[in-house]
């Protein structure tokens, strides 16, 4: 964890990252996409928690989430890169998952918002439609659902091996990531997103 200056940067910078735009909002936090100041291609999601809005219990939950994520390294669990404390905020620098969450994916029948990038198109969309087409009248492709479930089981089993119970597994807390080279080498289909379990505020 990193101690920041007593004031948050007025130019939209947190630590070594420049805030690009807001990608999410909660009752006591905003989430931004951000890029590294000297490596623009290096993206993170910055969860900026307003200290004044935290009750003692919420602060305890947040500190518990930070502690758990610092000790977790698994393909299907979102990665915490750093944590920066200022007088007004607690900033969690998280792995950036451009595919949004599973609830959006289900609601939009697989047609998720475009992955970030100048190309402006989801690189998985066309391949998914051709190789793993979703049912015409609702629902998701069976093979894709099986993959999502297998990935979730892998994450939950890992958490149980660490005596951790998430306690808030739901589609909104399952983020979608583009498969990396390591996953592809292990046989993960390139057309199917990786599931990343997020939001450990209620975990014990």
Where are these regions (language model features)?
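Conserved short submotifs of the Hanks-type protein kinase catalytic core
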Residues: 88-101, 105
């Amino acid at each position: 964890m990193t101690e920041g200056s007593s004031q948050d940067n007025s130019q939209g910078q947190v630590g070594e990252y420049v805030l690009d735009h807001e990608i999410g909002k909660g009752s006591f936090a905003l989430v931004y996409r951000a890029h590294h100041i000297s490596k623009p291609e290096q993206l993170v999601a910055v969860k900026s928690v307003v200290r004044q809005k935290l009750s003692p219990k919420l602060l305890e939950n947040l500190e518990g989430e930070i502690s758990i994520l610092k000790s977790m390294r698994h393909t299907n669990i979102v990665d915490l890169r750093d944590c920066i404390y200022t007088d007004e905020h607690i900033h969690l620098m998280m792995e950036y998952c451009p595919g949004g969450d599973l609830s959006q994916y289900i609601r939009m029948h697989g047609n998720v918002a475009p992955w970030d990038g100048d190309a402006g198109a989801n690189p998985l969309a066309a391949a998914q439609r051709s190789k793993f087409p979703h049912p015409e009248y609702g629902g998701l492709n069976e093979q894709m659902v099986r993959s999502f479930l297998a990935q979730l089981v892998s994450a939950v089993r890992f958490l149980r091996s660490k005596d951790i119970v998430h306690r808030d597994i739901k589609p909104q807390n399952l983020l979608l990531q583009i498969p990396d080279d390591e996953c592809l080498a292990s046989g993960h289909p390139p057309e199917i997103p990786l599931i990343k379990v997020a939001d450990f505020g209620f975990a014990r």
